[in-house]
Each structure stands twice: as C-alpha cells, then as structure tokens.
Amino acid sequence: MATETMGIALGMIETRGLVPAIEAADAMTKAAEVRLIGREFVGGGYVTVLVRGETGAVNAAVRAGADACERVGDGLVAAHIIARPHREVEPALGNGDFLGQKD
C-alpha cells in the first residue's frame, strides 16, 4: 500500500460526534476526487475522518468538509492536510487498528 500512496496527500477532519463526521465525509467525497480511507473513534465522542488524493483535491475536500461540519453545529474540532506524509507514517494509515476497523 505504501508505494501506491507515496506522495498522495492526507486530509483529516476531527469532529464532536458522529453526525458532523458523516456530514463532513459526504461533503468531502462530493467536493473533490478523493478517497475516504477511514474513520477513527477517538473517544469522548470525537471522530476523525481521513481522506487521500492529490494535494489540490484534498485541500478542496477538507475545506468543504469543514464548512459542512460547521453547518451542523459546533461539531468541527480540527481540519488538517499533510501534503506528502512521510513513508514511516504510511504503515499506520493502512493498519485496521488505527482506523478503528479491527478484524
């Protein structure tokens, strides 16, 4: 997985609650050509949604997701983009445990 995603941007939105997270994920995938790679239930009601794609697309998607999340209420906690995550980060992104999807 690491070789096919090297150089692809990572976008993250953290929300208070599941409804803003779903709203953000929907807006991000509709706004730009990005791939929804997962979600993480952080604890205390916080949810992080992650997308991958080209830097410009991820930037547009995260902006749209943050705007949509704010329309739901005070659900937006943080929004961030990493243009090219270091290769040491890639294994963590592909791990189901990290994404809250334990097998």
UniProtKB/Swiss-Prot annotation:
Protein name: Major carboxysome shell protein CsoS1
Gene transcribed to yield this protein: csoS1
Domain BMC: residue ranges: 9-94
A Pfam short name: BMC
Alphabetical list of CDD domains matching this protein: BMC_CsoS1
One MF annotation (Gene Ontology) recorded for this entry: structural constituent of carboxysome shell
GO biological process: carbon fixation; photosynthesis
Entry keyword set: Bacterial microcompartment, Carbon dioxide fixation, Carboxysome, Photosynthesis
Entry keyword Zinc: no
One GO location term (cellular component): carboxysome
Organism: Prochlorococcus marinus subsp. pastoris (strain CCMP1986 / NIES-2087 / MED4)
Family: Belongs to the bacterial microcompartments protein family. CsoS1 subfamily.
This protein's record includes keyword ATP-binding: no
Role noted for this protein: The major shell protein of the carboxysome, a polyhedral inclusion where RuBisCO (ribulose bisphosphate carboxylase, ccbL-ccbS) is sequestered. Assembles into hexamers which make sheets that form the facets of the polyhedral carboxysome. There are estimated to be 538 CsoS1 hexamers per carboxysome; note this number includes the probable carboxysome shell vertex proteins CsoS4A and CsoS4B.
PROSITE patterns: BMC_1 (PS01139), BMC_2 (PS51930)
Subcellular location, record wording: Carboxysome
InterPro entries: Bact_microcomp_CS, BMC_dom, BMC_shell, CcmK-like_sf, CcmK/CsoS1_BMC
Lineage: Bacteria, Bacillati, Cyanobacteriota, Cyanophyceae, Synechococcales
Oligomeric and partner information: Homohexamer with a small central pore. A CsoS1-CsoS1D-CsoS2 complex can be isolated following expression in E.coli. Forms a CsoS2-CsoS1-RuBisCO complex.
Domain notes: The tight homohexamer forms a small pore which is positively charged.
